[in-house]
Structure formats: structure tokens, C-alpha cells
Amino acid sequence: MDRKKAVKLATASAIAASAFVAANPNASEAATDVATVVSQAKAQFKKAYYTYSHTVTETGEFPNINDVYAEYNKAKKRYRDAVALVNKAGGAKKDAYLADLQKEYETYVFKANPKSGEARVATYIDAYNYATKLDEMRQELEAAVQAKDLEKAEQYYHKIPYEIKTRTVILDRVYGKTTRDLLRSTFKAKAQELRDSLIYDITVAMKAREVQDAVKAGNLDKAKAAVDQINQYLPKVTDAFKTELTEVAKKALDADEAALTPKVESVSAINTQNKAVELTAVPVNGTLKLQLSAAANEDTVNVNTVRIYKVDGNIPFALNTADVSLSTDGKTITVDASTPFENNTEYKVVVKGIKDKNGKEFKEDAFTFKLRNDAVVTQVFGTNVTNNTSVNLAAGTFDTDDTLTVVFDKLLAPETVNSSNVTITDVETGKRIPVIASTSGSTITITLKEALVTGKQYKLAINNVKTLTGYNAEAYELVFTANASAPTVATAPTTLGGTTLSTGSLTTNVWGKLAGGVNEAGTYYPGLQFTTTFATKLDESTLADNFVLVEKESGTVVASELKYNADAKMVTLVPKADLKENTIYQIKIKKGLKSDKGIELGTVNEKTYEFKTQDLTAPTVISVTSKNGDAGLKVTEAQEFTVKFSENLNTFNATTVSGSTITYGQVAVVKAGANLSALTASDIIPASVEAVTGQDGTYKVKVAANQLERNQGYKLVVFGKGATAPVKDAANANTLATNYIYTFTTEGQDVTAPTVTKVFKGDSLKDADAVTTLTNVDAGQKFTIQFSEELKTSSGSLVGGKVTVEKLTNNGWVDAGTGTTVSVAPKTDANGKVTAAVVTLTGLDNNDKDAKLRLVVDKSSTDGIADVAGNVIKEKDILIRYNSWRHTVASVKAAADKDGQNASAAFPTSTAIDTTKSLLVEFNETDLAEVKPENIVVKDAAGNAVAGTVTALDGSTNKFVFTPSQELKAGTVYSVTIDGVRDKVGNTISKYITSFKTVSANPTLSSISIADGAVNVDRSKTITIEFSDSVPNPTITLKKADGTSFTNYTLVNVNNENKTYKIVFHKGVTLDEFTQYELAVSKDFQTGTDIDSKVTFITGSVATDEVKPALVGVGSWNGTSYTQDAAATRLRSVADFVAEPVALQFSEGIDLTNATVTVTNITDDKTVEVISKESVDADHDAGATKETLVINTVTPLVLDNSKTYKIVVSGVKDAAGNVADTITFYIK
């Protein structure tokens, strides 16, 4: 039977079954058919889903979309058929079947308004169809680039982001992360990447058009902004459009350059009456006005950039500094020469080097003008008149017979000077004042025949006067006021709130808004206005140009409304818009302001008042971006977030935790579930903050690697109002309105097994210690195995048995002898994570000596070495091969003679060694090849080598004597290094380093820290006594002048070297005030007799705690109490810190917050363990003062036998913060 017939037969059977069920609802066979059809339909739903999901998951590729459609259509048909069959069959299970079908259908196939995880196949089809449409756009854009079609490229450049922004949410609805990621990476990411690669190209093209349009519209600021972006981006365009865009940009830049180059638009001239005259008829005392196309920078307008030359001979005309000035708006240059021009002469004014406010230079240009032969007024003077011109008149009464003198630049014809041509008129009434006018040479004298009225305005007019040569004298008018005053300021500008500005200082905190309001501090300010009163009434028409509000930095005049109250002589200034916040402004009252009598304020009375507006705008968070995205962040990598604010901040620090104490900053990284109103120390993730150089208000928030956890959500919180330390602006006046929260998630659960990455020799993770070749070892040798990730340390994951030893035989690698054993211990890295294991060769079987061995990490499916997620190491990793046996130096001693007899204890030792002794070196290997002088190197403290010979003892093959060529120095520490010795089979003897000290000369007293006869000595000051060499038991006494002994102190032997001693007063104990004391030190240091070395001193009133805690002694600790060592020695014989913890006793209570202890194996010249501050414990002191530091009561540290270790303790301090000296001692 073929497949089609089978399908038809199955369909017919199903229909028949449906009919039978309808007639026989209780028939078991019918029920079985319904269940089968329902089950088959559900299977088809899942098959349609698996068609895309399994293909993507297993192959990493998309299935043929036609296959997905086919299975999708089958699923829809199966659903319809199954629903019809269930409805026809009816029965008790009808509703359950229908509900089950609907649920499965809507989950896997289709639903009208699906939620996340529903309608999986339909959603995939929609997403795939959209993605292919997006890919078609990408291909069109790619083709445009290949064809170098810039117009088409720009078209699709804009289309693609619109699609991505408005429709790629379809991709996010697809069920299955693998499928979503493949859709994004294949279609969305590729389209975005291609589009983004053209960002500079399209921006240059758009900005070039913007320049052209802005230039045409006269918006040069907009054109300049676009030009700046073209210059920034043009070097970054792709090769595809570089040629075309370079040409496009050039055209735009040329258009901008032509429009932006400022220039002198026109030149005009006026006479002394402020009337315009032709440039061909300029009077000798005329004034030039140069009108500019743009506001000039005042600093560039001067007599060097505006110059005047005689045209004939190009001879410069001398101008004084004050002759050239610039208007307030910066657009008019006035040239008013102090020296008159020559009559009937042609001049030119040359402009060169002037710049606008943006630094752009004006076009160089020249303009000619010509002087006429008419006579002009050069001076007007008298003792009784004040006026508004540059002529020389003074204030005072003006009586009958007083005179006014007018001087011209040429001789005048006397017959033309009379009371008809020279008049004085009352401005108010028009009445002529009787005068007598006479002339002498070029001067007209006007004699009053009637007194002028104080405060009244008069007009002097001269008309129809001629020169002796027949030329006209200029028509001249002068309005003046008899005995008038300049309009000086009576009350400086004052705000509505009552703040009065002043000259010479900046007034801050001025409310800058037109409407009244309250700042963040809660202070109310009325609206913005300034009132100023004057000593006289004003000419209101002169206010606009001479009473101005200016933004200081830009020089821009602020549009303002001026109101004048003549009765109150008050000017009110109100800006037409709110002022900029946090900005300096100036109110300028300029010389051109006139009184109602026409009297000018004058330069001497000009005023400038400066004020700064309040900052009222709270900062906002513009954006938070993550360097690695906001989802799936890797916990083993450092993460970086960029936070950008709307303005600069006062401060921006990370929140930190010390123990359970939280120190709040302005930002914190916390766990997703943290309650921001009640954060705990465990909620906060360590983070750091750094400002981004060159970017205002921008900061980097950094989280180090391994601080975050897998499969977790987190918040980056920028704190606002209500927080302990909210974000504030740079003025510290305004606060971020509310908390800003940025969320992100980390990568999912770890399913990757750990692997071995490196092996290091010793307890080390330094690259210098990495094992790359065969290496000699012996029992006690350590290796550090580094793994690819953090390891589990519980349930025996890192214990013995996890690493075994094998040796190489003729039959290959076999288990090492039973006596060869290893131990395994966890090791933390710099981030406090266990990412390594320290393997110690705890035993070495005799049969394995001189064999080649290897370490093997054994796999185990259930309890092998595993990461923190429980993934067990999969491979049986061979780590390293090495020779097992390493011979060592047994000891180095001082020998009395060359036969090695009467030797001292083994070095190192503080016992004084005679300077004539030889050194006896003993090896534990009897079959040595040779020991040469270069194998035994002895050096003094300065590093100078000691010459000597090496000989073997008679009958001995492992004992050698080093005999110095000269006697050693007294009281000197010598180091001994034995290296390079080999046995006869080629094994290298382990390098060995030790030291000894020679006997010292008789010691002397070097110094006492308090001078003899000192006064005002600090009553708590530590007293230091120093000897030239070791003095084990000096006798030191302290007593008052009356003989009363003072013993409430501890005599501290600094560093236990018997050379420096300190008298440290007991806690809370001080010397008496203003009292004389005597400090005595015995001359015979061993017997304590004959006390005659002493100082006397007198105390003051001061007693400060500047005393560092001092080491009192080194001893042992039994868990509850401290026992001082009997001998003052730095050499202790200790097997391990667990059985025999070492205790250090200090002179006072100590604080170990920053204390550190390092342990160095000086035999092998390496640091073998660093004990953190948690491993030193002051709480074990039996008393409450905590004076004892106990080493290794928390972290066990077993030491190697026969090795010498150096212990260094640093960072111990007392309650006052005084840090103790670093302490060094040795154990073996």
C-alpha cells in the first residue's frame, strides 16, 4: 500500500471512529481512538517546534524555513482534526482533552496574543521572516558600498536602525536562548555592524549639506558646529567613500569659510557735532566709524590693528591708545584722533589682525578718506560751564561779563564774527542771551551781558563764519548746562531680596530667575530685578546703551527691560528671560549716560558690578553603559560600567565595606534582591570608581574579576535624595532627585570541568617558578598545581589521594613505592579564591631515590577534584616529571681546627664566633664529585667575598673545611652560600644559605635620646639608650632629684639585639610635671657597678602618646597564657606552628587590623607562606589588654624539617595608631 492510500485509509478510519464514538460514548475502543488522535496531535505540535529548535541547537544553523512551514501547517491541521473528534466523541474527558490540546497548541504552535514561551513555532516563523527582510536591507547596503553609491548607502543606513529599533523585539520573543542568539548574531548583529561601520561616512555627508543650508540661512553658528564635526569625522571615513566625501566636505568647508570670515562692512565719518559727513570731506577733528560684520574681540582692537596712513608716501599717522575704541556690542570701532588730521590731505585706515570672539581673524582691508579745507572747532573753554562734549569746560556759576572762548584751526575773518553769527539761546524758552562776539586770529571770545541761571540749559551756535582765505568755518553747536553735575551712582544695584552689589568684588548666590522661588536648601528668593539710584535725574534716552547687563565670559549683552522713575532718580533693570545658572554677569554703567541736563557720566564715574547666579539644577544620570553588556557577564572577568551625568559632580565614590561597617559613597553595586533602604554588608559587591579624563561628569565603576557570582542579578545604584551620601552637583547645592538603578545579570551555571593550566615549583603562583624541565626534589618538596577555575574545597575535594606519584621503570610508569607519599592542600589566589592546590612530597621511598617520578591527577566521576559547581576534572593529567632525590647540606659550623674537632653549634646562631675560626661544612651525601672554593662563598654584610681555601677532612668524603685567607672582622655578620656541588652521578646538591656573627669588640655607650640638662621634656616620651655593640644585661636606673626611684616602665630590648634599649612607660603612667630626674647607665655593663654615665632633665606639662608598641619578648603559647623564652635569642627550634605556636609579647595593647606576617624559607631562598592578618590573633591574650600576638593559631602551617625560616612581623600598632617597628626572628 503506498503512503497516500495509507493516509486516506487512516483518515477514513478516524472519521468512522468519530461517528462510532458519537453513537456509543461508552465504548472503550472509541475512547482509545480519541486518546490516540489527541496524543498524535500533541506529538505533531512538539515536532513542529523541534524542527527549528533541535536543528539550531545541534547544528548551529537554521533549518530550511519550508520544512518549518510544513510541520507548522501539519500541526494546525492536527489540532483542528483532534478538536473536531473530541467534540464529536463527547464523554467525561471531553473538556480535559480540549483543555490539554489548547494548552499544548498555544504553547508550541500558535496563540493570538502570546506570552513569553507561547506560540513558539509561529513566533519563530515571524522572527525568521523579519530577520531575512532585515538581511535583505543589509545586502542592499553592502551592494551600495561595493558600488560606491553614497546616496543609496545613506538611504539604507537610515532604514536599518529604524527596523532594528522598532521591530527587532520580534527576535527577543523567540523561545530558546540558542535560537535567539543565532538570529541576533546572524541577522541583527551583522546588519548593525555594517550600518555602524558607515557612521562617519554618512555623518560627513549629512553635515556637509547642513553647512550649505546653514550658510544660506545666515546661521553661521550652526554652520560652524557642522564644520567642526566634518573635520573630526572625515579622517575616519571608509575607503569606499573617502574620495567622494573629501570633495563634498571641501565644498562645504569653502562655503563656510567664505561666510564665516568676518570683515569691515562699512566706514563712515562724523564731525564734532555728531553729524555725518562724506568720506571725501572729513573735518580735521572728525571721527571715523568702522561697522563690522561680526562682534570683535576687544583685546584685538587697538592702535596696532587699526592704523591710519597718509596715502602720499604711506606715512603712518600717530594714534594714541585711547583714540581707538570698540562699542559694547563689539560691532563698531570708533577712531577719534587726539591730534587733528592735516587739511586737504588724503588718508587711509587699514584693518589688519582683528579677531572675532571665536578667534577668527577679520579680512584685511583698507579704506580712504580726504580732509577738507573748512575751519573746524578745536577747543571750547571757560570757567563757568559744564557740557557733554570733549571740549574743555568746567562747572561753576556764570555771571555777567564772564566769557566763553571758541578756538578754530584756522585764522578767521573778523568781519564775519558778530552777535548775529555767534549766539547763546535758552534751550527751554528760546530766548537769546545778549552777548558780545569778537575775534583775534583763530579765536572767538563771547562775553555775556546777562548772567546765566544755574542748572538751565543753553545752546551756543556759530554760523556763517569764514576764514581769512575765504573758506567756510564749520557750523558749530554746543548744548551746555550752567553749573550742572554728572549723574553719579547714589545706591549700587540692589536685588529684590535686598542684596546690594559692589564694585571690585563678586557677589554670589544671586537668584537668577524672573519668578520667585525656593532653592534646594529651602531658602525663598523673590523674582529677579535690580534697582539703582542716581545723584541726579537722567536723560532716559541714554540708558539703553549705557546701563547694560552683560554675560562676563562671552561679553554678550543680555536683553533687558529698563524702567526709569525720574522722581526717585531710580533705574530698574529686569532681564527679559531667566539668567543662566552658576554664571557670572556684570551690570555696566558707562560713561555715555547723561543727566537730564545733558551732562555725561564720564570715564572717571563708570561702574562695573559683578554677580554670580545660583546653581538650581539638580544633576541627572544621562546613561549607564556596561563594557560587556547587561546580560551573561562573565564572573571571571573584570566588569566596567560607564556612568554619565548631566554635569560635573562634587564627588563620586564607591560604597565600601569593612567587616560589618558600611561606608556609603554615591554609587554601589548590590545584589538584585537587596533592600536599598536597609543594605547589609553582604549585599554590597566591592567596586571602585575613577573619573574619565576629558569627559565632564563621566565616571568608570569597576568590579574586579571573581567578585560576582554566576546566574545572579545585580543592581548598580546611583544614590539620590534620601540616601546617606547622595550625588550632588559641583556646587554642592543640588541633589540627584532619586536613586538611579541599572540592572545586569551574570552568566549561567558552570557546566565546564576544570583543567590544569600550570605547575609551579614550591608554594608559589609566580611565573618565575613555573616548572618547564626536570627538577631535583626530596621529601618535603612542594608543587603548586594551578587550575582553570575556582575549586571546591568541601567534601574532601582537595585531600591526599587526589594526586598520586608514579615512577618510570623498564616496564613503563608504575605506582611509586609505598614510602613515597604526597599531601594535597588548597591554595588561594590574589582574589581569595581557591584556584590551585599545593602538593607536598611528604615521604620518599628508598627504592624511589634517583628514579624519575611524575605527579598524576587522578580522575574520579564522583569525588575527584571538582570546581565550585561540582564539575569533576575529566582527564588523567600528567603534570610533571622530575628526579626524586636531592642531596643537601647537613650543617655549617665553626671549627676550632682543620680536623673539624670542637665545632660550634650549627649556624645560624647569634653566638659570637672567633674571628680566627674556619668553617666546617658537612653534607648528607658521601659520594661527592668535588667541592671547590667557588662552591662555598662567604660574604660580609657589605657583600664583599672572603677569600679562602677548601680542603676535605682526612678520611672523610662528606666533610670539608673552608679556611679564610685572613682573619675575619670583629662584630660582623657573614653569610655563607653553598651552591653548585654535585654527586658523582650528576645530582646537584640543594643550594644552602646560612649566616653567623663574629665576636664583637668591647661595647661602649653610644647615645641617650634625652640631652643632659634638657627642660620641658615630654612626660610620656620614650627614652632610647644605644650601645655600640651587644650589651645583654645593662643596668639602667631612673630616679628623681631627691633619690626616689621611678620603676613604672618597661625596658625594651629593641629587636632583641642587645644594642638598643627603650624605656617605655607603662600604659597611663607618666613622669611628674616640672620635676628633675636623673637617668644613669652602668659603666661596667656586665656587673652593673660603677654608675657614672648619666643625664639629668626637667619635665614639662605635656604628655602625649607617641610611643610605638615595642617587642618585649618572644616566647611560646599554650592556648591560654604566654611564656617568655629563657634566652634572649631570635633562633627558635620549632617543628610546626600548630603544636608549638610562637607568641610575641608587646609593651602595650596592640591592634592587628593591618598587621602582616611573612614566613620565608631562607634555606631554599624563597617565601613559602604568607600568613594573613586573620592568622595572627591578639584575642588569645589571657588579659584584657591584648598585648600578645600569636602566630598560626588559625591557619595551620607545618614547616619542613632541617630548614631555617625567617619570620617578619609588620604593621602592628597601638590604640593611638603608633606603628611598631618591623620585627624579624628565625626558627628551625
Curated annotation (Swiss-Prot):
It is found in: Secreted, Cell wall, S-layer. Keywords: Cell wall, S-layer, Secreted, Signal. Gene3D superfamilies: 1.20.58.770, 1.20.58.780, 1.20.58.790, 2.60.40.1220. GO terms for cellular component: extracellular region; S-layer. Its main location: secreted. InterPro entries: Cu-Rt/internalin_Ig-like (IPR014755), S-layer_SbsC_C (IPR041378), SbsA_Ig (IPR032812), SbsA_spectrin-like (IPR054605). Residues 1-30 form the signal peptide. The S-layer is a paracrystalline mono-layered assembly of proteins which coat the surface of bacteria. This is S-layer protein. It comes from Geobacillus stearothermophilus (Bacillus stearothermophilus). The gene is sbsA.
